[in-house]
């Protein structure tokens, strides 16, 4: 169920100081833009590669985020966080695991932190600009200040037009490259009531591990 350590244990929001560093200023804009939305939907693709070990893993999924609440879906599982409890639903096993907010049992991705992880703990430096389907993507190189993370650096791609995150690339010290690409980013959606409510009645034959 663990998809890899990319996404990662290094997330937190809540305020950071302005800087004359252009990379910091751009990321301030990104954080302010994302924070202004009532909710966000996006799809994602995830690729983990290590050529030396001949490893390649791929998955895709979708996310809905509203403040601290989220629904994360990948092919083998769905995780719902209602602000207090996490509900991890495993259809293949007909099992549901219920844990509290502080438990580190994310499906490789923490949607609460994914959109803000860059705000603390990294040295920042502007990198290349790429043209992707007509959109200018500015990459920022993030070098961890904590050298025990097992990460050489990350590249965070920002769409300069929308100020949304487009791609996160992590280069591990063991040669592993992990790429997360956000697609179909949609803010301020009209969500159904109960989007972030777990209803056990929808899973009558499931074992619930509370």
Question: Each predicted region: which residue ranges?
Answer:
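Sec-dependent N-terminal signal peptides
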Residues: 4-13
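N-terminal leader/targeting segments and the immediate start of mature chains
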Residues: 15-54, 68, 205-210
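An acidic-aromatic
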Residues: 60-109, 178
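Flexible, surface-exposed loop/linker segments and immediately adjacent secondary-structure boundaries
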Residues: 101-136
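Gly/Pro-enriched, hydrophobic low-complexity segments
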Residues: 122-130, 135-208
């Amino acid at each position: 169920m663990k998809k890899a350590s990319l996404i990662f244990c290094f997330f937190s929001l809540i305020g950071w100081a302005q800087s004359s560093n252009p990379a910091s200023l751009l990321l301030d804009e990104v954080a302010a833009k994302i924070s202004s939305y009532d909710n966000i939907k996006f799809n994602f693709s995830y690729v983990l590669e290590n050529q030396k070990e001949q490893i390649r893993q791929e998955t895709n999924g979708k996310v809905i985020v509203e403040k601290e609440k989220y629904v994360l879906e990948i092919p083998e599982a769905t995780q719902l966080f209602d602000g207090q409890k996490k509900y991890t639903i495993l259809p293949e096993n007909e099992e549901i695991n219920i844990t509290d907010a502080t438990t580190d049992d994310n499906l490789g991705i923490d949607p609460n932190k994914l959109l803000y992880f860059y705000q603390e703990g990294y040295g920042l430096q502007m990198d290349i600009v790429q043209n992707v389907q007509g959109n200018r993507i500015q990459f920022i190189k993030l070098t961890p200040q904590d050298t025990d993370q097992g990460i050489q650096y990350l590249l965070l791609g920002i769409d300069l037009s929308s100020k949304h995150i487009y791609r996160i690339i992590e280069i591990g010290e063991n040669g592993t490259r992990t790429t997360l690409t956000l697609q179909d980013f949609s803010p301020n959606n009209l969500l159904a009531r109960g989007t972030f409510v777990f209803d056990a009645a929808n899973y009558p034959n499931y074992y619930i591990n509370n």
